Amino acid sequence: MPINIPINLPAKQILESENIFVMDEKRAFHQDIRPLNIVILNLMPQKIKTETQLLRMLGNSPLQVYFTFLIPSTHTPKHTPRQHLEQFYTTFSSIRDRKFDGMIITGAPIEHLEYEEVSYWEELREILDWSKTHVTSTLHICWGAQAGLYHHYGIRKVKLPKKTFGVFEHRIMEKNERLVRGFEEFYYVPHSRHTDINMDDLKAVSHLKVLSISDEAGVCLIASKDEKQVFLTGHPEYDTDTLKEEYERDLARNMEIDPPVNYFKEGPDGAVPVNRWKAHATLLFMNWLNYYVYQETPYEWK
């Protein structure tokens, strides 16, 4: 079954051009199937780009999936057209009484701020608490993962002396975990962050399990033992060119930035990005959707 998205969502045309099976709401209505309901709290500035990246990761699912896009009501996005937000997004007050099979909380480029300095922090705390009783499993990405670990377990982020930036090799720590089923022992994930999570702090929380780590990029994949919370410190959803765009952006701002590690390959026309992560990224999202969401969610929420 395909992902089920609004007929006018910009991502629809992009995904269809990539041969990813999508279905609009009108067609999905005629299928006598209970779709999975996933809410995406999109905290990234370029919301349309992030929507497309996440929907691409979930687009090969055999399950029919319906998406609700969420933004904080206490923050006004500056990089997404107002019309798009009004047409496709909602706020927490309109969904707080609903139950969802899964939730994705994206990253946000606000690592330099303390959590309490973030304009929507109190609202995010409320959403995180709500997710424990209204969502089967929540996937937190990058800053969203750090914020979730801080809120739920009191684990603080640690400022790095140098930005972790590039595509890094990771190894599986728990080979029998459902979330990494089908993975090779080593796989790649893009990272782009100035802060990290300390492994000793994670080990001190008995309710958490570390599923993969990198010698260079640190801890990557963490899950709660009840599988209701997943924390991903990298960006497996990134497009091939995303790190390149971030690198060129920072150069244009005259920032000190090294080229992303293990990312560019010299070709006849100069250095070009190489995508080493897409297959495992898709598998990770599929495993989360199948094992942590579909296999665990009730057919009828009470």
UniProtKB/Swiss-Prot annotation:
Location(s), subcellular: Cytoplasm
Record site feature (Important for acyl-CoA specificity), residues: 111
Keywords recorded for this protein, A-Z: Acyltransferase, Amino-acid biosynthesis, Cytoplasm, Methionine biosynthesis, Transferase
Site (Important for substrate specificity): 192
Record flagged with keyword Cytoplasm: yes
Enzyme class: transferase
GO BP annotation list: L-methionine biosynthetic process from homoserine via O-succinyl-L-homoserine and cystathionine
Active-site residue numbers: 142, 235, 237
HAMAP family per the UniProt record, alphabetical: MetA_acyltransf
Name this protein carries in UniProt: Homoserine O-acetyltransferase
Natural source organism: Bacillus licheniformis (strain ATCC 14580 / DSM 13 / JCM 2505 / CCUG 7422 / NBRC 12200 / NCIMB 9375 / NCTC 10341 / NRRL NRS-1264 / Gibson 46)
Gene: metAA
